Amino acid sequence: MQIRVLGCSGSIAAGSRTTSFLVDDNVLIDAGTGVGDLTLDEMTVIDHIFVTHSHLDHVLAIGLLADSVTRARRARNRPPIRVHALAPTLAALRSHVFNGVIWPDFTRLPDVQAPVLALVPIEIGQVV
């Protein structure tokens, strides 16, 4: 297993990136500003994002990532990126981020049958 630290700071000062870890090229743990340092090809192969909690420094790049990779994932016939989190965290994302006001609802785009994101509830102690 390879873990690449993309960010581990709570700020965006010069040289700092907010929390995000890339595991084996296709799994993100949190989606802070460090995700922006990945190439489009690196972003396109991310299949899972595990979100520890809904603070902006941990979820900020989910929408940006989804927007960036929609065409490339569709061209490669990739499944939706699965965003795994506790139900309250997913509810916060749906209500406050992917609501059509702050950011488009990528669980319904580019279309309902083939969205770029899928929100997947997990429970404490669950093995995924």
Which residues does each predicted region cover?
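Binuclear metal-dependent hydrolase catalytic cores
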Residues: 1-128
